[in-house]
């Protein structure tokens, strides 16, 4: 019975993907070719935001995950993914999984989601990561953006404890909540429990991986976002956030990796949320740092483009004052 349910869930997921029409990546993709061995060679740099030693999804990793997480294996087999748990199937499955990551890094987000979900639990991580990136940068309206982010959270809810097996899955889940928390009203955020879930999930992730740059920057952005909504005093007394903690999280993130565009523009936003115009020069400095970085994948190209737009807004603001 459980196998039937798992297979049904997988089928429903694939049907949902088929109905979606996502916008294509708007920039040149020629610099994001990670075919063949290029993916493994570039993997440490491509995944530096996830922290040190995020595992490359080769056949050895596939078998390790299958052995360590029997429920994931059961779901994968039930989903008719072509992987039966036998070592002789692992290489073919790993190649398919690697290709999903290639699609993510190249900016073929819709195809990455489709092919990722077709691989079952193992492919959900890059599939949902592709969806988060697409939702944040390419969705034309806020309602659709929120729907896609909520779907990411729903996928991780269905995965249950399996989310704990992958730090990117954990990050994607809390990132989606944090982005929704920024844009939804305070009553809605409170009703959904995001004000406690976001810091709790970030604490759990950082306890497991203290040096993850993305998670550290997200925590800093969360602190700033709460201050922006409720003010410094209420933020500190009610939610335990502060400008000092915001600064500490970003400093730790930059110490781990200072060449991530998103880190610099998120810090620029945080400075504005917390200090207003008082740290305008510093915000502009970090936006310029983001813009100066050469993107090595599609997500970073979107981040640099976003930083350019923010920088233009700040420069126009300065010119008017």
PLM region spans:
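Positively charged n-region of N-terminal signal peptides that target proteins for export
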Residues: 1-4
